């Protein structure tokens, strides 16, 4: 795991929602994330450590209210944790580099993987592939 900033530093540099999601395994309200409807070509990075997580070509509209992807950029980019909270068994996904909470993965996505990586916008930074503009979720 990469060295990540201290909690004090993160609180100073992140919005309350970004801190809640990435550091406290929180979930932003559905259909509120800044990157939900982003359709530009580029790469989605971890907001905390800037590690690449998802290519825009793997993003799709699942209708669930959060950005959804069917495949990460690499196996190492995502860490998978069994999540038994809320009386349901799910698989939590975290950044493979800094361990920031991203969301969950479900086995109901499209082909070719059949997986839906349901990710909080607040855990992501998008970099536009054409002009390099960065947008924090």
UniProtKB/Swiss-Prot annotation:
Keywords: Metal-binding, Oxidoreductase, Zinc. GO terms for biological process: protein repair; response to oxidative stress. It is an enzyme of class 1 (oxidoreductase). Pfam families: SelR (PF01641). The gene is msrB. This is Peptide methionine sulfoxide reductase MsrB. Zn(2+) binds at residues 46, 49, 95, 98. Belongs to the MsrB Met sulfoxide reductase family. Its cofactor is Zn(2+).
């Amino acid at each position: 795991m990469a060295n990540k900033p201290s909690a004090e530093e993160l609180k100073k540099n992140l919005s309350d929602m970004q801190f809640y999601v990435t550091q406290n395994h929180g979930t932003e309200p559905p259909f509120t994330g800044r990157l939900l409807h982003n359709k530009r070509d580029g790469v989605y990075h971890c907001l905390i450590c800037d590690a690449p997580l998802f290519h825009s070509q793997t993003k799709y509209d699942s209708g669930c209210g959060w950005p959804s992807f069917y495949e990460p950029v690499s196996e190492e980019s995502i860490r998978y944790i069994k999540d038994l909270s809320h009386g349901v068994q799910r698989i939590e996904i975290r950044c493979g580099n800094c361990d920031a909470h991203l969301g969950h993965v479900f086995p109901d996505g499209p082909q070719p993987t059949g997986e839906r990586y349901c990710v909080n916008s607040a855990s992501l930074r998008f970099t536009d592939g054409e002009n390099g503009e960065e947008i924090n979720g």
